[in-house]
Amino acid sequence: MITGKQFFTAICLLAFAAVAVGQDDRKDKTAVTYEEIYDEPYSINKLFVHFQPLYGELFATNVNAGFGLEASYYLNDKLDFKAHFRKTYSKNFYDFSRDLAQKISDVDNRTEVYNYFEFGGTYHVKDFTESSKTKMFLYKNSYKGNKWAARVPLNAEIPCKVRKIYGARLGGIIWDSSTDINRAMEAQGLVHADFKNDEGNGLPEGVDIFSNIATKGLYVGGSLTWIRNVAVSFDKFETGVDDLILTTYFDILVSPWITLDDIVYTPKDANGNPIIADRKTYSIGAIKTNTFGFRAGIEGKFNRALSWSYGAEAGYRPSVDGRGFFAMLKISFPVYSTNLDYKVEAFGK
């Protein structure tokens, strides 16, 4: 005897099969012809300027989000350079440690805004092209609106050239931030008494401690870049373009210059008023830092005068020991690019 559950399952399977057959039997699924407009992966713009309205970073030292600016420059087929800056919009959006410090900190240390600077270059160890294929979606102007949203888009595989770059990366990283020392103490098994003043006395128990961290370091690593710059004209569809510049990379991070601000604490009397005469500075030296780290990332942009780009990376950043893990996502729009070549040949009559 067939139960209701079995009957319902059979109906669902039949419906799925009918949809699959219907999609495979589409009337517009016919062979297409095309004409190549260009296929030149070496003819890309030289300068790209990225405006980043939003990035987000899960960083154990300080969770943060904000805005940024980035620029990259390609020097012939030998080198490319990149400079990047980002910071938080405000302590509320989103500078977690700074915001928390201003709410609950018991120490007198100022709260540092999160700032991040990165600059470096990539040497093209091997820069070459090889035969490849790319998938292009087939689109008609008649697909606008609901028609496009209601259909599974067809795609065609187009032969093209892909440019590959094996790169060697080197650069510098500078960043500073507020940080929660209470969490660092938990990670390293420390107590308040481990922070001593000039008289050898420890910091009183129960004090919520926040400080600031500043680092200067280097990164060295490798990258692999794929560049396609191809356009074709289809006979019954709109022009297809694939101009993606995709880069993956892995870096070793080294920061020999890491500084933490010492703790400045002023005790309060029974009425909650600070006792200025008893203000003391306590050494932060008990907190261990980690000089080495790593990261892996991916970045994508398009070889167009006006477009957008994306990027993501994760790893372990040199910082307070045990507080270096991070994962970051960034979106850029708009991205302006140009080849910086406006000369044309002129001949006398």
Question: Where is each model-derived feature located?
Answer:
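Repeated loop/turn-to-beta-strand initiation elements of outer-membrane beta-barrel proteins
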Residues: 77-83, 127-132, 230-232, 303-311, ...
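Glycine- and aromatic-enriched membrane insertion/assembly motifs of diderm outer-membrane
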Residues: 62-128, 252-257
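Short glycine/proline- and aromatic-enriched beta-strand/turn motifs that initiate or cap beta-hairpins
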Residues: 23-89, 175-182, 334-336, 349
